[in-house]
């Protein structure tokens, strides 16, 4: 335990909190251009082909981000909006692409949780 004198000379250091989403630069979302759109497989207990895209952001960062929902219209050079949020079973994927914004369309025929997938309200029959 330090003495009062030692604390006067050198105060206690605050622990630096490291950002989980460094590429966002403390912004809620960032715009970027897809450089590669592909599928990848998840970690051990799970099995699937997860849709991901490598995105070059406006601040120069290049990140891998997840494309949620069923089906998408992304290809190389598509302009997308990314937000934070990792995918637990995909190592290195710390961002999500926002559906229904810029070049990425919303999920078709989505009835529930529509706002998360950029789907418009369905017409009454």
From Swiss-Prot:
GO terms for cellular component: small ribosomal subunit. This is Small ribosomal subunit protein uS12. SUPFAM superfamilies: Nucleic acid-binding proteins. Residues 113-125 have a biased composition (Basic residues). PANTHER family: 30S RIBOSOMAL PROTEIN S12 FAMILY MEMBER. GO terms for biological process: translation. The modification 3-methylthioaspartic acid is found at residue 89. InterPro entries: NA-bd_OB-fold, Ribosomal_uS12, Ribosomal_uS12_bac.
């Amino acid at each position: 335990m330090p003495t009062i004198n030692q604390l006067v000379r050198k105060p206690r250091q605050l622990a630096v909190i490291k950002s989980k989403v460094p590429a966002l630069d403390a912004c809620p979302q960032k715009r970027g251009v897809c450089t590669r759109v592909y599928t990848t497989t998840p970690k051990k207990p799970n099995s699937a082909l997860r849709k991901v895209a490598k995105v070059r952001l406006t601040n120069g960062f290049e990140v891998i981000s997840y494309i949620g929902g069923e089906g998408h219209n992304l290809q190389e050079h598509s302009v997308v909006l990314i937000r934070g949020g990792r995918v637990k079973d995909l190592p290195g994927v710390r961002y999500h692409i926002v559906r229904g914004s810029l070049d990425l369309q919303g999920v078709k025929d989505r009835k529930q949780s529509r706002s998360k997938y950029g789907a418009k309200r369905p017409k009454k029959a």
